[in-house]
Amino acid sequence: MQLKEQGLLEQRGRKLMAPQRDTEQFHSAWLLSRAMQETVQRYAVVLRVLEISQTISRGQLEKTSRKIAERLSSLYGMSSPEFYDKNVFSCLVTALREQELVISTEDGTLKHSDNSRALQADINQLVWPEISQHLLQLESV
């Protein structure tokens, strides 16, 4: 595992842990987690929209996800415009389809697969708690 080899994760018994806080490796791991957080949050948004909608067109999934991401950005101070960029969401949905994490129905709409539900459960543990709470409060899109 490269993260362990680089000292960004440490094995302690059966657990993988962050390095000690006063180390350069901890700072590097923290920077990496910050860089990845927006990507993880975008996945959480798209997967939540899929969950709420049951089935949805690709265009509507991207549009709705962008609107939610833009709202999250303004609420939680994420100042990078690429957080809710149209092309980023388009690529994300394409990747989900290519990896068969979402299913294309006969009428061309998209829906959750068993794999995307498992991914969603994992992703929800990684996003900031306030983002997760906000997404859970969405009842319709």
Q: Model-derived features: where do they sit?
A:
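Membrane-interfacial terminal anchoring regions of lipid-handling membrane enzymes
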Residues: 1-141
